[in-house]
Amino acid sequence: MTIKPSDSVSWFQVLQRGQHYMKTWPADKRLAPVFPENRVTVVTRFGIRFMPPLAIFTLTWQIALGGQLGPAIATALFACGLPLQGLWWLGKRAITPLPPTLLQWFHEVRHKLFEAGQAVAPIEPIPTYQSLADLLKRAFKQLDKTFLDDL
């Protein structure tokens, strides 16, 4: 049974949480086969960087060549909307509760941090992907790189 993310979060907060999740998620190659976050993060960062200038270029180019204003604006809005879709997906993913298989893995990584003598924050009632990202980021910083091999 999949629990749906909280519906009380506004669309702006979802985008903010997506940006925070994108910054928090560790960009480690060993996580890429299991989690799509690495690919979504790379594409979203690319879109944030290059789509607004592309939108301005296509808008001015179509207007300068005598094109109609409607399609030019639609193209520019589409180009600017692509990175927003990535942030929206990441924001929704950040507030989604972990499935049972990942929940067990979450507790194992948390236990490894505890065994290493690191102070661990109390667990939320229902851990989310954001709490997994925070835990993994901390584990990659404070544990040796082979901690994933043992799990």
UniProtKB/Swiss-Prot annotation:
Pfam families: DUF412. This is UPF0208 membrane protein YPO2564/y1623/YP_2375. Disulfide bonds: none annotated. Belongs to the UPF0208 family. It is a multi-pass membrane protein. NCBIfam families: PRK01816.1. The chain crosses the membrane at residues 46-66, 69-89. InterPro entries: UPF0208. Keywords: Cell inner membrane, Cell membrane, Membrane, Transmembrane, Transmembrane helix. It is found in: Cell inner membrane. It comes from Yersinia pestis. HAMAP family: UPF0208 (MF_01101). GO terms for cellular component: plasma membrane. The keyword Transmembrane applies.
